[in-house]
Structure formats: structure tokens, C-alpha cells
Amino acid sequence: RQAAKAKCRSVAILLPEGTDARLMAEGAIYGMHRPSGYKDQKPWPVEEVILLAGAEPAEADRGQLTAEGINLARELVEIPANDLGPEEFAMRAAQEGAAAGLEVEVFDETALAEMGAGALLAVGQGSVRPPRLVRLSYVPENPTSNDHLFLVGKGITFDTGGLSLKPPSGMEKMKYDMGG
């Protein structure tokens, strides 16, 4: 905040020995997050924070990756459902996945029908915007084991499940369901 007040565009922070470089990196990146631009706001002057992590650069890198992922999730949740429907979400997931070196597959309603995803298609019939399913896969070049790890998340851009059970004041928060 002090750097922003001073209108600094770049800030370097020397971390004292014993400082948790991962947490410092996370905090710096979380602090730089700004909403997606749907409200009038002054531009954030700080464009870059450099952490001089001494003996823990790998931990700082880990914190950076974690915080950037969380800020991406925050950004997606902030986008109104009329601007981020299933197709837009799938396109963004494909862009982010490809940039991270992942294999990306996007299944449209035809592919979903072919795979027998009737429940997903049935829920999608409640919208004029058809559903999408995104598969992001990481396949290492030289795997050291036959073990597999699966992470499953949902990118429901606006969850109307239980709509009749929610009070009117709860309607605006239904878009946050995609955040987990």
C-alpha cells in the first residue's frame, strides 16, 4: 500500500533471513489483486514486486504460483454470469491450461451427449447457454510411477440449484458457487 501511495511501479523487497518466502510471495501477489474492472476504480500503480528471497527462491516461486492461481479463481468468480458463461469459461480454461503446458479438451453439448453426460445436459437445459466440460491433463515426459492423481473441480458459472429455497438476498451470491 505504501508503494501504491508513492506511485511506485516496481518494488523490490529484501527478505530477512528466517522469513517465510512462500508466504511473503503469496501476500504480495494477493495484495496486487484488483477486481475485474466492473466498478470504477483507480488503476493500481504497482506493476511488479520483486522478492529477493535469499536461500529460499524455490519457496518464493511456489508462493507466487499458488497466489496467481488463487487470484485467477478470484477474478473468474468476480465476472458476472452474463459475461462468463460456460463457453467463455471453457475458452479461458483452455487458454490458461495451454499456457501452463497442459493438454486441453473442451466437450460441447454434442460431445457430452456422445459420452452419456445426461445429467450435465439436463441441468444445462435450464439455460440458453449450453454446458461445457473441460478436461485439463498433465502427462509427464518421464513418469517415475504408474500412480495417477485426479483433481476434479466444477466451473458452474451460475448455480440455480435450490433456487426456490434461497431468499432473494441470496440470489446475487449464486455466481460464487464456481469458487468452490
Residues of each region from the PLM?
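N-terminal hydrophobic/helix-forming segments and targeting peptides
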Residues: 1-157, 165-170
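Acidic/histidine-rich catalytic neighborhood of metal-dependent amide-processing enzymes
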Residues: 163-180
